[in-house]
């Protein structure tokens, strides 16, 4: 029994590590997307997923994995890819039209939506303590992001919120697919291939020539996205959303650090308050879930 408990705790810690790593690379991806400038949104999503597809294909070849869709998980893979791509498009659309803080906040609703979708699709019900911790982290995110909806376009704000919802749904279908034995690298490969094929014809309708710098930025976004996708897919295969999704908020901290180093941005007092709230919530969730695992 003690050995089983230890194994369960190890899986939880692995999920946390992979999710935090994913958050870091998603923060890098957003930085590259922003630095790519006035490239059309669909064009950005194409190059982001096109380069990610190369990395995902390499993982498929290394593991000698067939590209044939696994039986029993086809619906989950299609839904993960469709929801995931919709989330990427809506998120990029929001980033291009809202302040980065507004767009980031709306996208960070995805873990909250993941728990809601997990309740219906996976029958994983969070208890009152876990709900309270997640809401506390969300409040901390508000301190950090300080959204100014007064100056935001209503359509872009709705798009950003829907993007977070789509991302939350996608992560839930990741859990369903990997729970049926689908490997994490196959999930990433299928998503990248699906997104590239969907984006290509749409991109041709409004293609804009890019500079070398813009091209390099989008290559960076694709590589960062691929690494982040591998990590987040693996994270949700180790543990349910209700136990680890809180750590996705660490992306806010990484974004602030990257902003300081790359853009010379210094967080204000409210941001530091938010950091403290988020880190405290993450620590409480970690201790609470570990205690539950031992019981």
PLM features: what roles do these ranges have?
Residues 129-146, 270-289:
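Hydrophobic transmembrane alpha-helices of multi-pass small-molecule transport proteins
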Residues 41-52, 93-110, 153-166, 211-225, ...:
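Structural signature of hydrophobic alpha-helical transmembrane segments
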Residues 104-109, 180-193, 229-260:
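Helix-helix packing/entry segments at the starts of transmembrane helices
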Residues 93, 110-132, 253-272:
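C-terminal transmembrane-helix exit sites in multi-pass transporters
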Residues 2-43, 151-176, 295:
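Glycine-/small-residue-enriched transmembrane alpha-helix faces in small-molecule transporters
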Residues 25-39, 44, 89-100, 106, ...:
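Juxtamembrane C-cap of transmembrane helices in multi-pass membrane transport proteins
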Residues 1-24, 53-79, 128, 152, ...:
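Membrane-interface interhelical linkers
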Residues 23-27, 57, 81, 85-89, ...:
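Hydrophobic/small/kink-forming positions within alpha-helical transmembrane segments
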């Amino acid at each position: 029994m003690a050995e089983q408990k230890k194994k369960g705790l190890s899986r939880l810690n692995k999920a946390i590590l992979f999710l935090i790593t994913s958050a870091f690379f998603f923060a890098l991806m957003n930085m590259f997307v922003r630095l790519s400038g006035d490239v059309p949104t669909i064009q950005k999503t194409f190059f982001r997923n096109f380069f990610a597809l190369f990395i995902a294909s390499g993982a498929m070849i290394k593991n000698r994995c067939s590209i044939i869709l696994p039986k029993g998980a086809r619906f989950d893979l299609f839904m993960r890819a469709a929801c995931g791509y919709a989330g990427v498009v809506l998120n990029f659309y929001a980033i291009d039209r809202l302040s980065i803080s507004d767009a980031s906040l709306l996208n960070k609703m995805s873990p909250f939506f993941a728990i809601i979708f997990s309740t219906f699709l996976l029958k994983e019900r969070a208890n009152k303590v876990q709900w309270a911790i997640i809401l506390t982290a969300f409040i901390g995110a508000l301190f950090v992001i300080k959204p100014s909806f007064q100056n935001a376009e209503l359509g872009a704000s709705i798009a950003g919120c829907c993007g977070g919802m789509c991302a939350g749904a996608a992560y839930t279908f990741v859990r369903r697919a990997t729970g049926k034995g689908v490997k994490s690298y196959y999930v990433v490969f299928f998503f990248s291939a699906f997104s590239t094929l969907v984006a290509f014809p749409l991109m041709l309708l409004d293609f804009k020539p890019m500079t070398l710098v813009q091209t390099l930025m989008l290559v960076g976004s694709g590589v960062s996205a691929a690494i982040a996708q591998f990590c987040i897919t693996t994270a949700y295969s180790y543990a349910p959303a209700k136990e680890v999704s809180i750590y996705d908020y660490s992306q806010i901290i990484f974004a602030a650090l990257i902003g300081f180093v790359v853009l010379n941005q210094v967080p204000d007092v409210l941001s530091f308050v938010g950091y403290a709230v988020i880190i405290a919530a993450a620590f409480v969730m970690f201790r609470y879930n570990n205690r539950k695992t031992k019981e």
